[in-house]
Amino acid sequence: MTKGILGRKIGMTQVFAENGDLIPVTVIEAAPNVVLQKKTAENDGYEAIQLGFDDKREKLSNKPEKGHVAKAETAPKRFVKELRGVEMDAYEVGQEVKVEIFSAGEIVDVTGVSKGKGFQGAIKRHGQSRGPMSHGSRYHRRPGSMGPVDPNRVFKGKLLPGRMGGEQITVQNLEIVKVDAERNLLLIKGNVPGAKKSLITVKSAVKSK
């Protein structure tokens, strides 16, 4: 069954394995999440649990939000997200979900929102090849052909310049190197999407090796 937790990306560092190998890791702070709601097939059409992470001031939340979290006897949360495919009987409303649900060596999928890069050209945004840079060439870094003349339009999906980044990305099959239960930290091998302090979702790998 799937298990997951919401956290915040702290940054990257490196640790040494027992054999002396240097391992680059991303540090994710996953303070205890609270189960705000259990969604059932009878009431909602699907099964899921709703997790809340990172308390926020009541002054910044509205009445429906306060009433919703009151059922779980907790404070309003800054980040709320649903997890499907979990073992529903293992969770109760108001229960805390901590980093101890994971252990070192587990393979997980990590979801976050990539860093925004602003308006970028087709070469940086899509990895296209540039034209000759030598004297006489009139084609360097432009997008190139827009397609055939006859349709009198540009087809959807044409790779063009535009806003880059700021998209939800999932990196699959990352290994948990260490779980620090005292400080609510997960050390995950490699890099994960998102800027520092951004929201990260860590879930059991869908395509685990």
Swiss-Prot record:
What GO cellular component is one of the record's annotations? cytosolic large ribosomal subunit
Which keywords appear in this protein's UniProt record, sorted alphabetically? Ribonucleoprotein, Ribosomal protein, RNA-binding, rRNA processing, rRNA-binding
Superkingdom field: Bacteria
Any one GO BP annotation for this protein = translation
Query: What Pfam families does this protein's entry cite?
Result: Ribosomal_L3 (PF00297)
InterPro entries in the record: Ribosomal_uL3, Ribosomal_uL3_bac/org-type, Ribosomal_uL3_CS, Transl_B-barrel_sf
Q: Does the keyword rRNA-binding feature in the UniProt annotation?
A: yes
**Region entry Disordered, spans:** 122-152
PROSITE patterns, alphabetized:
RIBOSOMAL_L3
GO MF, one annotated term: structural constituent of ribosome
**Protein family (similarity comment):** Belongs to the universal ribosomal protein uL3 family.
The function of this protein is:
One of the primary rRNA binding proteins, it binds directly near the 3'-end of the 23S rRNA, where it nucleates assembly of the 50S subunit. Strongly stimulates 23S rRNA precursor processing by mini-ribonuclease 3 (MrnC); 20-30% DMSO can replace L3, suggesting the protein may alter rRNA conformation.
Report quaternary structure and partners: Part of the 50S ribosomal subunit. Forms a cluster with proteins L14 and L19. Interacts with RNA helicase CshA.
Tell me the protein's name. Answer: Large ribosomal subunit protein uL3
Which organism is this protein's natural source? Bacillus subtilis (strain 168)
